[in-house]
Amino acid sequence: MFADSAVACVISALRAVGVDSPLMSELVPRLLFVHAHPDDETLTTGGTIAHYVRRGADVRVVTCTLGEEGEVIGEQYAQLAVDHADQLGGYRIAELTAALAALGVDAPHFLGGPGHWRDSGMADTPARHQPRFVDADMAEAAGLLAAILDDFRPHVVVTYDPDGGYGHPDHVQTHRVTTAAVERAQWQVPKFYWTVMSKSGMGDAFAVARDVPEEWLQVSVDDVPFLYTDDRIDAVVDVSDSIEAKVAAMRAHATQISVAPNGQSCALSNNIAMPIPGVEHYVLVSGAPGPRDARGWETDLLAGVNLA
């Protein structure tokens, strides 16, 4: 539970029966997640999003592109891809909307509006269409996000680490834009985090995943190159209470994610099986840390935040 959680739960209950006031809005925890493409919000932070929504927080997700360059899983929608009809971006808006609904978030928000910047593709792919997000003017992009920060006034902001998690140019650019926006905004963000993947956490998830589809390539945790060791992590969120919502959101991104029938693992277009862990990990970039457990980790991103 986060700080002032009892207040947040009472406010959530009152709003459910139509009672609201500006004072109540001021006391509700607000979290902003900034992601590069539709599906990133679910893969990296979906459990955390649903976890805090369930506890009465106001959660917003900003997505920087429509993911037009994504590879399409399966034949049903293969013709939407960039080398064919190039209509994948619009379809992924619908997928994102459904995924966010599964997580408890009302609607998507796109930086600059839907389609303002295009998915840049992987680092080794040609620049087939413009304007690519990786080429976005930093002042414009950071200014647009800073305006969102000043309007929404989040207590917590989450985005990727400097490597963008696994090196995708749009993830790296999202990190840069978010960092610049946090520095530029008039609103002083109390806590700023990177979403990361823990080697120990993924190792535990690999150990318990069962009934992986035969057609998927099975690897070990040692084959995953972008994981963080425990000494580099500052916070963990137990998302076991919201794992069903995360799995449902993954299934909503059907052009991008395959989910095992038992919901314990998933695969992208590369068909590499990855477990779906019941914990999500973070690095605290700025802001005062809250109480820590025996490992030295916070267990609540809102720990220590004054909501008043």
UniProtKB/Swiss-Prot annotation:
It catalyses: 1D-myo-inositol 2-acetamido-2-deoxy-alpha-D-glucopyranoside + H2O = 1D-myo-inositol 2-amino-2-deoxy-alpha-D-glucopyranoside + acetate. One of its GO terms (molecular function) is N-acetylglucosaminylinositol deacetylase activity. It is an enzyme of class 3 (hydrolase). The keyword Metal-binding applies. Gene3D superfamilies: LmbE-like. Its EC number is 3.5.1.103. Zn(2+) binds at H37, D40, H171. This is 1D-myo-inositol 2-acetamido-2-deoxy-alpha-D-glucopyranoside deacetylase. The gene is mshB.
